[in-house]
Amino acid sequence: MSEKKSQEKPCSDNNQIEDPSSRPEVQVPVNYVYRILQEEQYTPCIGSTTSDFLLAMLDYLTDYILEVVGSEANINNQQNISQDRERQRDNDREPSRGFKNAPFSLFDEMPGPRRNG
């Protein structure tokens, strides 16, 4: 147990200002941050108002990210639909080249049955 206590740093050591560019980027899942804030494991270091603020900020950022992703998906979907319509118009204008040499077309008469009766 004494090893664990010696490894933990008190909150007062966190007062040193660290250059953010010197730290490697850390990617932490939103659920993990939310759970930590809910469990209030860092209560001795941050006050309840700070915890509330961070939770509100996390909710706001999550909503914003979802809104941006949704609008991007809608824009991409609309672009794909307009491109599909342009392709369809181009295909309607020119007959298909693969069927030019076919001995029949879709509008020819249906041949009669081969057997009678």
Curated annotation (Swiss-Prot):
GO MF entry, a single one: structural constituent of chromatin
Region called Disordered, residue ranges: 1-25, 74-117
GO cellular component, one term: nucleosome
Biased segments, Basic and acidic residues type: 1-11, 83-97
Description of how the protein assembles with itself and partners: May interact with the N-terminus of HD.
The protein, known as: Huntingtin-interacting protein M
Organism (species): Mus musculus (Mouse)
